[in-house]
Regions:
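Aromatic sugar-binding surface patches on proteins
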Residues: 105-113, 216-222, 292-295, 301-308
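Short acidic/polar inter-strand loop motif in beta-rich domains
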Residues: 119-120, 130-139, 239-244, 323-333
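Short flexible loop/turn segments that cap and initiate beta-strands
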Residues: 76-100, 180, 191-208, 278-282, ...
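Beta-strand-rich structural segments
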Residues: 49-77, 165-192, 264-270, 322, ...
């Protein structure tokens, strides 16, 4: 069966042609007009503000100064930008050891933060936010981990015994009895939070091996699994006798599986709810940062529904797929990334002159688009000694704006995911979204009383 999907855009209304593989025509979807109105209202009342900090480096000695430039971005629904940015430096206990604030002008601010001389060596966190951002989950503040060394040779960063933490993340949110599910997982060092490359096995209550698994990138991986509610499962890692729990298994529900094809995004919905869904109205919605992109009807009476969405009609960066019913309750959800953004071509040229015994470097920057047409921009340049900086372990502006800022917490080695020329990049991003991609926008807010901003 063929259906026309309405794609909502600020510029125009497009259509996606998708194929639905099922035995009967799907019923009418949730009213996209009403849903769009709800999204627009929520986006208007809760505009998204993001900050990015460009620093001189990420390794410092106590007593040194952190130099930075702050960049501010706003969602299209924002009518006013915050005027003050707050920047905190906190220790491993979450205690703020230094805070500064700067005025924002034209979406930017330049400044510095002096590191107290008495600080002990260790890992610290630099955090940036505005008062408006404090109305939402602080996990979406700008975060960056710093290493600060003490002034004494004896003041070394303490070494801790390695202890593993293993967590499982069913694609779409839940494990459903008897339905094949993709389960992503992450193995990290409990002390550092860094990914650990290892392998493990799923065991049943009798100790029988049900499924082996292995990490593929920075402690992350995935495998397919058919859970049985009557069984009890545990997981163990190689060389570790710790028993790790598998997420609970629901008797009934939906499972969402997403696969990247050459020219389409394939979405498979399976369910075992049964006859009670024959008169139910379900919709799979695509949305991004509070903006509704598409509404796809789903026939609740069918055990399987398959969509193939043309990639050239999908947005750049991260967007969300959510399956809802007519009361706007979410059944499963996941984040998806399909397109890298277009970037400017920057060409740097420099000249060096000697003045009063010192060398002075002048740098010229030429910015053009992919057609070679010059483009204006706001730029910052950091210069640091190589042993004090590890640029590959932190975000750049593109990775943060289009990827990491949509995830909770910090992304380990974000540049390892960001290579449009690498055929493995999308697979790595998939694992990142499946493990750290907790949803930013809960549709349950549509069914709750209005909450006034605290700030």
């Amino acid at each position: 069966h063929l259906c026309i999907l309405k794609i909502h855009s600020a510029l125009t209304i497009l259509c996606l042609l998708c194929t639905i593989h099922c035995a009967a025509a799907p019923q009418k979807a949730v009213s996209d007009t009403l849903l769009s109105a709800r999204f627009n209202r929520y986006a208007r009342e809760n505009p998204i503000e993001k900050l990015y900090l460009h620093q001189d480096r990420t390794n410092y000695y106590a007593g040194e100064t952190i130099w930075f430039k702050v960049y501010q971005t706003l969602s299209s629904s924002a009518t006013e930008a915050s005027r003050i940015v707050y920047i905190d430096l906190s220790n491993s206990k979450g205690e703020i050891v230094k805070q500064v604030k700067y005025p924002l002008a034209d979406g930017a601010a330049s400044g510095s933060l002096s590191i107290p001389e008495h600080l002990h060596a260790g890992h610290y966190q630099l955090r940036a936010y505005t008062r408006w951002m404090q109305n939402f989950d602080p996990e979406f503040f700008f975060h960056r981990e710093l290493t600060i060394y003490g002034n004494s040779e004896k003041d070394n960063i303490p070494q801790q015994t390695t202890k593993f933490k293993l967590r499982f993340f069913p694609e779409g949110g839940n494990l459903i009895n008897g339905l094949t599910s993709r389960i992503a997982f992450e193995v990290v060092d409990a002390n550092t939070g860094k990914g650990v490359q290892t392998e493990g096995v799923i065991l049943n209550a009798h100790g029988d091996s049900i499924r082996k698994f292995a990490t593929s990138h920075l402690g992350k991986g995935s495998f397919f699994f058919i859970p049985q509610k009557k069984e009890k499962y545990i997981a163990r890692l190689a060389g570790d006798n710790t028993d790790f729990k598998i997420p609970s298994i629901s008797e009934q529900g939906f499972v969402m599986t997403v696969k990247h094809l050459k020219e389409a995004l394939r979405i498979l919905l399976t369910q075992n709810i049964g006859p009670s869904t024959k008169n139910s109205v379900y919709s799979l919605i695509l949305h991004q940062e509070g903006r509704l992109i598409a509404v796809l009807p789903v026939d609740g009476s069918q055990p399987r529904t398959l969509f193939d969405l043309p990639l050239d009609k999908l947005p750049t960066g991260v967007f969300t797929l959510t399956l809802i019913d007519e009361d706007y309750h979410a059944y499963c959800e996941r984040l998806v990334f399909t397109h890298f953004p277009e970037t400017l071509n920057l060409k740097l040229s420099s000249t060096i002159s000697v003045q009063e015994g010192h060398r002075k470097m002048s740098v010229n920057i030429r910015s053009t688009d992919k057609k070679g047409i010059p483009q204006p921009g706001s730029f910052s340049l950091a210069v640091a000694q190589t042993f004090l900086e590890q640029p590959t372990i932190r975000d750049n502006f593109s990775t943060y704006l289009f990827l990491s800022s949509n995830l909770k917490g910090q992304t380990e080695q974000p540049l390892s995911y960001w290579n449009p020329e690498d055929t493995e990049s999308l697979s790595k991003i998939e694992l990142l979204l499946l493990t750290q991609g907790w949803r930013r926008y809960s549709l349950e807010v549509f069914n709750q009383p209005d909450n006034l901003p605290r700030y």
